[in-house]
């Protein structure tokens, strides 16, 4: 089942496109009145219930790689999760080509490079998974139900590891745009409110 959650997009063409996909039965669409970041997914996750053992969550500004040996990225992640029960969340690696020469993203580049130092196994780096598409186990979080809140990356059960697949490398288009850096009101007030409510932190490069 393919589900799209729209967090109060302002682009009318985008909204029309999503409605067209819904009307054709291609996707199930949730449209929120506020951009509350991860909170926006929770109504959808509640409706999914507990029937799924694995849930894939994907950002909309991400380019996916070509199939690896005939397998799409999602099939590769599912297979890796099935054979590695100690991995609770598995994402794609991210190309750094669009930030390596940006001085104002030097700290971000350095941090991302650190995520390719330690291995969980031959296929997976031990790495934080944030802005990349990822596959989650439904019992990943200590609060029981599978729900997402600001700061959820620190709420993993201690016996689960988090990683990025070494061979599946995507491209984060959000880093192409220099407005990713703080040059104006790029983060909506409602999104900031959702972080403040749960004590979530922002990267200094973003706000």
Question: For the regions a protein language model found, what residue spans apply to each?
Answer:
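C-terminal catalytic/acceptor-binding lobe
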Residues: 111-207
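Active-site acidic Asp-centered loop
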Residues: 7, 58-61, 66-67
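Poly-acidic low-complexity segments
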Residues: 11-13, 52, 72
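Short aromatic/hydrophobic "clamp" motif used to bind/position activated sugar donors
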Residues: 55
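Acidic donor-binding segment of Leloir-type glycosyltransferases
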Residues: 1-34
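Short, well-ordered coil/turn elements that cap or connect secondary structure elements
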Residues: 22-24, 50, 84
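A generic signature of intrinsically disordered, low-complexity regions enriched in glycine/proline
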Residues: 10-15, 36-39, 46, 63, ...
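Conserved catalytic core of nucleotide-sugar-dependent glycosyltransferases
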Residues: 37-41, 45-48, 63-148
């Amino acid at each position: 089942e393919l589900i799209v959650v729209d967090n109060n997009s302002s682009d009318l063409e985008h909204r029309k496109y999503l409605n067209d996909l819904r009307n054709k039965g291609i996707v199930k669409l949730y449209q929120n009145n506020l951009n509350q970041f991860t909170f926006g997914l929770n109504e959808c996750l509640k409706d999914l219930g507990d029937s799924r053992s694995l849930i894939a969550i994907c950002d909309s500004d991400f380019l996916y790689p070509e199939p690896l040996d005939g397998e799409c990225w999602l099939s590769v992640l599912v297979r890796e999760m099935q054979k590695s029960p100690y991995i609770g969340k598995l994402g794609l690696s991210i190309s750094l080509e669009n930030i390596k020469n940006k001085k104002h993203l030097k700290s971000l580049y350095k941090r991302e490079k650190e995520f390719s130092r330690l291995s969980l196994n031959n296929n997976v780096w031990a790495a934080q998974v944030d802005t990349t598409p990822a596959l989650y186990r439904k019992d990943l979080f200590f609060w029981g139900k599978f729900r997402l809140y600001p700061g959820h990356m620190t709420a993993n059960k201690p016996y689960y590891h988090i990683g990025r697949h070494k061979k599946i490398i995507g491209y984060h288009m959000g880093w192409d745009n220099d407005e990713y850096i703080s040059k104006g009101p790029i983060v909506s007030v409602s999104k900031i409110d959702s972080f403040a409510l749960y004590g979530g932190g922002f990267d200094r490069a973003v706000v």
